[in-house]
Swiss-Prot record:
Its cofactor is Mg(2+). Homotetramer. GO terms for cellular component: cytoplasm. Belongs to the NDK family. This is Nucleoside diphosphate kinase. The active site is at H117. PANTHER family: NUCLEOSIDE DIPHOSPHATE KINASE, NUCLEOSIDE DIPHOSPHATE KINASE DDB_G0292928-RELATED. It comes from the Bacteria.
């Protein structure tokens, strides 16, 4: 197994529900470690830039509107197979397909308001981490 980093967002609906701690606890209880975190209020430009790959898709505008509707918590998670493990913890993007016990089954409100975002690959993780974190803002933790 490889130690890697992945990127995670706790989205506005989950922040509004005051479940940040519960979500972080799920990550940490499965061996992922938070090595970077920031609470942010995205601007429209930041949200559009982050989700640029979805520009032109039918859900793009509603996704951007949702992501700027309230604060978010962006974080870098580290651990063995962090990308895969985070995606398992989050559950399916579509709430209808999210298995019981996953973050989305527990906290999502809809397809768009699905509580969390996580990188889909190591390459995406590197790009997404760099979008929100400068050099020196992510720290390796002693285990």
């Amino acid at each position: 197994m490889t130690i890697e980093r992945t990127f995670s967002i706790i989205k506005p609906n989950a922040v509004a529900k005051n479940v940040i701690g519960a979500i972080i606890q799920r990550f940490e209880s499965t061996g992922l470690t938070v090595v970077g975190a920031k609470m942010l209020q995205l601007t429209r430009e930041q949200a559009e830039g982050f989700y640029a790959e979805h520009k032109g898709k039918p859900f793009f505008d509603s996704l951007v509107d949702f992501m700027i509707s309230g604060p978010i918590l962006v974080q870098v998670l580290e651990g063995e197979d962090a990308v895969r493990r985070n995606r398992e913890i989050m559950g399916a993007t579509n709430l209808a397909n999210a298995l019981a016990g996953t973050l989305r089954a527990d906290y999502a409100d809809s397809f768009t308001e699905n509580a969390v975002h996580g990188s889909d690959s190591a390459e995406s993780a590197a790009r997404e981490i760099a979008y929100f974190f400068a050099d020196g803002e992510v720290c390796t933790r002693i285990r």
